[in-house]
Amino acid sequence: MQTVWPLIVSVTQNGQEDCSFGLGRARYSPENSKECGNVAEHPPDRILRDRISDTASADGPGFRGRLAAAVTAAGGLGLVGGGYGEADWLLAQIDETDGARVGYGFITWSLARNPGLLDNALAQQPATIMLSFGDLTPFAERIRGAGVPLTAQVQTLHQARLALAAGAQIIVAQGGEAGGHGMGARSTFTLVPDVVDLVAQRSAETLVVAAGGVADGRGLAAALALGADGVLVGTRFWAATEALVSPRARQRGIAAGGDDTVRTRVYDIVRQRDWPEEYDARMVGNALTARWHGHEAELSARLPDVRKEFERAAAAEDFDVITVLVGEAVGLVHDVRPAAEIVHRMVRDAARILNQ
């Protein structure tokens, strides 16, 4: 029997920001498929050391560290997001991990405004640091110098080349199906093999993780078939028991399908988040996005009034105005389950598919 060694990466969102990530590796042997009992047989940090020389999104308080720890406990390796540069918030998330060995992810252009946050993360001796959305070279040497594997999330083959040149040891290839921030230029199904081939030619020891549209074992199996070492999972973990998501937000997300999601900059304009123009975000569409998508200049001109409406809607949890940042895979999410069950089921189902 073949043994499947996937990376399990979780990205969690509570409807406002795509800032919480998880990275991990789980060992799954089909001989033990009934119990999935050896998912955590080898610690993820040890496996990362074996494979890498020297050595896995809306905002809201309190759950990302807890969820990252739960993914780690399940045999994955949780990755806590650094948010938009608030040190107190990051330190609170570190406390939430309760000592679990996790990694940390940062929005790169935001980290550049408060680079001291990287020191907070490196002080935890993390399993990895993940950088997304911007130039990672100013931080790469510090991360590698600390003996921490550097993970880079990319949306194009050009970005993957830059990540390899900067010394990334793990590359997350994110397709436009993904929830939260990214780019819509490439799909997961074509970007992943492009990046896999590039890595094979230039840096065979670098791991490739597929992101975007993966919510179950079928997606994991497909990613492995494309040559990826594993998957980054966001929307499915948004509906994990450990995610601090309000009942109304969960209801909105679980009721939605992939056809209900849109890529737009409207949400960032209203929240006054200064994202670079090349990035937008996928979310469940609503009256706000329908009204203003394609009319961003007019939205900016009327922003004070729209922001007042948005703030009232946020207080009332009015999802015709506020939204949940989830990906196209939301149509595959039908319930709320513990993170451990999500990890075990995904790996078990992928192994069954690949060994048929």
Predicted regions and their residues:
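Active-site entrance/lid segments in N-terminal catalytic domains of soluble metabolic enzymes
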Residues: N32-S203, L207
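Detector for the Zn2+-coordinating histidines of canonical Cys2His2
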Residues: Q2, Q13
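Residue-level detector of alpha-helix initiation sites
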Residues: G62, G213-A215
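Ser/Thr/Pro/Gly-rich low-complexity, intrinsically disordered segments
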Residues: V9, Q16-C19
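Residue-identity detector for glycine
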Residues: G15, G22-G24, G37
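Conserved active-site-proximal phosphate/metal-binding subdomains
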Residues: A165, A178, R186, T190-L207, ...
